[in-house]
Amino acid sequence: MSNHDPISDMLTRIRNASQKKHTTTTIPGSKMSLSIAKVLQKEGFISDINEEGEGYKSQIILSLKYSGKNKFPTIRSMQRVSKPGLRIYKNTRGLPKVLGGLGVAIISTSKGVMSDRDARKQGIGGEVLCYVY
């Protein structure tokens, strides 16, 4: 079965693993998935990224973060914004602040995948991939 939207698949795998309190989750490897994972790590939502394999058989293993003794997930929600059937683009002024700045919007720009904060600092807009909080 082919996967028409690998970003949605990645977000769903992370969301499901987080809800079940798994320590790691595996996602199919791609440049876009790796870029999104690096933004999530930089923003403190995941703790570690490991790559396995090469080419079309590559996989990315993400180590999820939890807080407190009850292992409360760091990622509370992940929402896909721009979809294959309806792309959402925003300029610098139109970039959203997720939960008043507590969450992160992941943006695909001409300078790579980055958080909304980094895109605002650099003064560029792009495609809003997802919201994470």
From Swiss-Prot:
Q: Name one GO molecular function term.
A: rRNA binding
Q: A Pfam family matched by this chain, by name? A: Ribosomal_S8
**Which SUPFAM superfamilies does the protein's record reference?**
Ribosomal protein S8
> Which family does the UniProt entry place this protein in?
Belongs to the universal ribosomal protein uS8 family.
Q: Which organism is it from?
A: Prochlorococcus marinus (strain MIT 9312)
Q: Which NCBIfam families match?
A: PRK00136.1 (NF001109)
Cited function: One of the primary rRNA binding proteins, it binds directly to 16S rRNA central domain where it helps coordinate assembly of the platform of the 30S subunit.
Listed GO cellular component terms?
ribonucleoprotein complex; ribosome
Q: Determine if NAD is one of this entry's keywords.
A: no
Keywords, comma-separated and alphabetical: Ribonucleoprotein, Ribosomal protein, RNA-binding, rRNA-binding
Could you describe the subunit structure of this protein? Part of the 30S ribosomal subunit. Contacts proteins S5 and S12.
User: Which GO annotations describe the biological process of this protein?
Assistant: translation
What is the name listed in the Swiss-Prot or TrEMBL entry for this protein? Answer: Small ribosomal subunit protein uS8
The family database entries (InterPro entries) matched by this protein are listed as: Ribosomal_uS8 (IPR000630), Ribosomal_uS8_CS (IPR047863), Ribosomal_uS8_sf (IPR035987)
